[in-house]
From Swiss-Prot:
This is Uncharacterized protein ORF5'. The keyword Hydrolase does not apply. Pfam families: DUF11. Keywords: Plasmid. It comes from Methanothermobacter thermautotrophicus.
Length: 499
């Protein structure tokens, strides 16, 4: 808007110079900062009487304010101003000095206005230049109301949408030289337009109206082709008008249309959210296009963490390589499936992330493009058992010391028992994680009075079964000299080893 308030005062100045014929002069100036007075606003008219190179006496100025300018106040540095006659009795003015009168007027009319002033003084030998005239135009006020509507609330690519812009002048005066700007979103290509008055510049996208009378309404209709997704709109604004507008808040309007693209809905899951090191899990990713537009060159970024080692990949369409699943085009309501078989190679808590994108077409609902699956992998615990069988012909005594190191946690156990010929004893040492080591120190005694052959069989059962056989002849009797065996057992996911 050129003028958004009617309370802004304009200042007009009338200069009247008086003095001897050698120096007298008269002139009129308009303050260029306030060149467009508006109806019902306040205007200051300033009259200045200035002496030339000689003193002037009994200076009197007459200022005629035309009808429609309501004098509200005045002030002067010298003299007296008569409101009824418009006479300003100035008095004496020393050489080269000036005296001023300011009239504060309410502009209660529109159109062309002329203010005249005349000054006389004793000793003025050049009265011909003692007249001044100030002409200006008072603009009216208008309340321009702007509205815009869209023919569709939602649309698809390739549709056409019609925007109807309505401009109404609610007065009280006619509006002139109106410029209404249309700001169309990218993705709205103008196909055609029509208007009831004025003209439309489709390059500048400006609707120009010469005059809009009080109560009159004008319409601009613009048909646009939709070639992009998203929330597209026509934002309209009254950019210029000669008249002052008493209500600038209804000078702008906006109409929008929602253009949906694709809606890639991604779901990610794992077959074992709680797993153990060494387990095999399936990472399943499903992508569905909820439409309405086809997804072009759809792809999913799915990079497995280092804790998972890919064993096999199955896709019902596209290819998966280096953490990227290239699907291709997905039609409306079409889905694709990716199944990755992976082995848990280390324990810990880790996250699998997946993101679906369709670079060629905007996704109208990006909230469901991402998903996350959590896996908590622990080191598995295995039962450690030992069976000791006496294969000797005599009763034996077993003294067994076990020192178990489960990743720094030490467990010590001691067993002392007798075994008759052909009998066995089962020992359950507890549950331990993979990577545990167990040190066995076994002392086996001959309980007979005479030297005998000591023969026994130890079966270790953990991640696998391993058997240790010992056969020593000539072992002293009466438990004097035991058979000593030291062995270290390692619990590994690939099996149990004995050293």
């Amino acid at each position: 808007m050129r003028n958004g308030t009617l309370l802004l005062a304009a200042l007009l100045a009338v200069f009247i110079l008086a003095g001897s014929s050698a120096a007298a002069d008269v002139g009129v100036e308009l303050d260029k900062n306030n060149t467009k007075p508006v109806y019902n606003s306040t205007l200051r008219v300033k009259v200045i009487a200035k002496a030339g190179n000689q003193n002037v006496q009994n200076a009197v100025a007459t200022v005629k304010v035309p009808e429609g300018l309501v004098l509200q106040d005045y002030y002067t540095a010298q003299g007296y101003y008569d409101l009824e006659t418009g006479t300003w009795e100035i008095g004496d003015i020393p050489a080269y000095e000036e005296r001023s009168l300011t009239l504060v007027c309410l502009l209660n009319r529109t159109g062309n206005v002329t203010v005249t002033a005349n000054v006389t003084a004793d000793g003025d030998e050049n009265p011909a230049n003692n007249n001044a005239q100030l002409k200006f135009r008072v603009r009216g006020i208008a309340d321009l109301e702007l509205n815009v509507t869209s023919s569709k609330q939602s649309a698809r690519l390739g549709d056409t949408v019609t925007f109807n812009v309505k401009l109404k002048n609610r007065g009280p005066h006619a509006a002139n030289n109106i410029n209404v700007a249309n700001f169309f979103s990218g993705g709205l290509a103008i196909q055609s337009y029509s208007y009831t008055t004025g003209y439309f510049d489709d390059v500048a996208r400006e609707w120009i109206l010469e005059t809009l009378d009080t109560g009159e309404e004008a319409t601009l209709t613009v048909v646009c082709l939709v070639n992009r997704t998203g929330d597209l709109s026509d934002y309209v604004s009254v950019r210029e008008v000669d008249e002052g507008d008493v209500n600038v808040y209804n000078n702008i309007a906006r109409a929008s249309v929602a253009v949906k693209g694709t809606d890639l809905d991604l779901d990610l899951s794992v077959s074992k959210p709680r797993a153990y090191q060494g387990d095999v899990v399936n990472v399943v990713c499903r992508v569905k296009n909820n439409g309405p537009e086809a997804a072009q060159n759809a792809r999913v970024n799915l990079q497995l963490p280092a804790n998972l080692q890919v064993q096999n990949v199955q896709v019902d369409r596209g290819t998966y390589s280096n953490g990227v699943w290239v699907i291709g085009d997905l039609a409306d309501n079409e889905a694709a499936l990716l199944n990755i078989t992976a082995r848990v190679v280390s324990a810990g808590n880790f996250t699998v992330n997946a993101t679906a994108v369709s670079p060629a077409i905007d996704d109208s609902n990006p909230v469901n493009n991402d998903d996350t699956a959590l896996v908590s992998a622990a080191i598995p615990k295995k039962a450690l058992k030992v069976r000791i069988k006496n294969n000797s012909a005599v009763t034996i005594r077993v003294l067994l010391y076990v020192n178990i190191n489960d990743h720094g946690k030490i467990t010590r156990k001691t067993y002392n028992f007798y075994l008759k010929n052909g009998l066995s004893r089962d020992l359950s040492l507890g549950y331990f994680q993979l990577g545990t080591s167990a040190l066995f120190k076994q002392y086996t005694y001959n309980t007979n009075y005479r030297p005998r052959t000591v023969s026994y069989e130890n079966t270790y059962n953990a991640t696998s079964v391993i058997t240790q056989r010992v056969n020593v002849s000539g072992v002293k009797g009466r438990q004097k000299a035991p058979v000593v065996r030291i062995a270290t057992l390692l619990l590994d996911e690939n099996g149990t080893s004995l050293q």
